[in-house]
Amino acid sequence: MKPYQRQFIEFALSKQVLKFGEFTLKSGRKSPYFFNAGLFNTGRDLALLGRFYAEALVDSGIEFDLLFGPAYKGIPIATTTAVALAEHHDLDLPYCFNRKEAKDHGEGGNLVGSALQGRVMLVDDVITAGTAIRESMEIIQANGATLAGVLISLDRQERGRGEISAIQEVERDYNCKVISIITLKDLIAYLEEKPEMAEHLAAVKAYREEFGV
C-alpha cells in the first residue's frame, strides 16, 4: 500500500465516507463495511479528493487526453481531478461531462465542457453494476473517442451475480483497465495495522472469503 492510499483510507474514515459495522447493500448482501462518496461534500473535501484521484492517475501510468465525469456523481470528481492534475502535476488537461437531459436551447446537446475526443479517462466514485460505465461508453463511442481507462475511488473486489466482479465485466466488455485509489485488499492491509480494529478485520476477511474475486 502506498502512502497516498493509506492517507485516502484515513481521509474516508474521518469523513465517515468509510464505515465499518453491518450494512445491507442494494444487492441484499450484508456487508461489514460501507463506502458513501457523497459525504465528501465540502470545498476542502473535494480539493483533497481531487488530489487522491490525480495521484492514482499519475501512479497508473495510463496515457489519456481528457477526463470524463458521468452525471451526476462523476461531474465534481472530473472537475476536481482536472484542477489537481494542473496544480500538483503540471498536467493541464481538458474535462467534459454529460447531462442526463439534453438541452434544446443555448449550446444544446448533452455534453458540457471540452469536446469529447481522443483517449478518454472516465472518473467516477464506484462501480456497482457497471450501468453508468455502459451509458458513458455509448456517449464516448458516439463522439468518435476511445476509452483509455476508468478510475474509481474503491474497488470492492467482490463478485456480481456471476463469478466475476462488475469491474472485471467492464474490463472484459470494453477491453480497458479499471483502476482505483484503493481496493478491498488495501482496506484489509490497513485493518491489519490496527489492533484495535481486529473485530472489523475478521468480519471483512469473512466477507471476502464468501464474496471476493
From Swiss-Prot:
Enzyme Commission (EC) number: 2.4.2.10
InterPro entries: OPRT, Or_phspho_trans_dom, PRibTrfase_dom, PRTase-like
Keyword line: Glycosyltransferase, Magnesium, Pyrimidine biosynthesis, Transferase
PROSITE patterns recorded: PUR_PYR_PR_TRANSFER
Residues involved in 5-phospho-alpha-D-ribose 1-diphosphate binding: 26, 72-73, 99-100, 103, 105, 124-132
A Gene Ontology term for the protein's cellular component: cytosol
A molecular function (GO) term: magnesium ion binding
Matching Pfam families: Pribosyltran (PF00156)
Example GO BP: pyrimidine nucleotide biosynthetic process
Cofactor(s) needed by this chain: Mg(2+)
Family (UniProt): Belongs to the purine/pyrimidine phosphoribosyltransferase family. PyrE subfamily.
Alphabetical list of NCBIfam families matching this protein: pyrE
Job description of the protein: Catalyzes the transfer of a ribosyl phosphate group from 5-phosphoribose 1-diphosphate to orotate, leading to the formation of orotidine monophosphate (OMP).
Protein name: Orotate phosphoribosyltransferase
Organism from which the protein derives: Escherichia coli (strain K12)
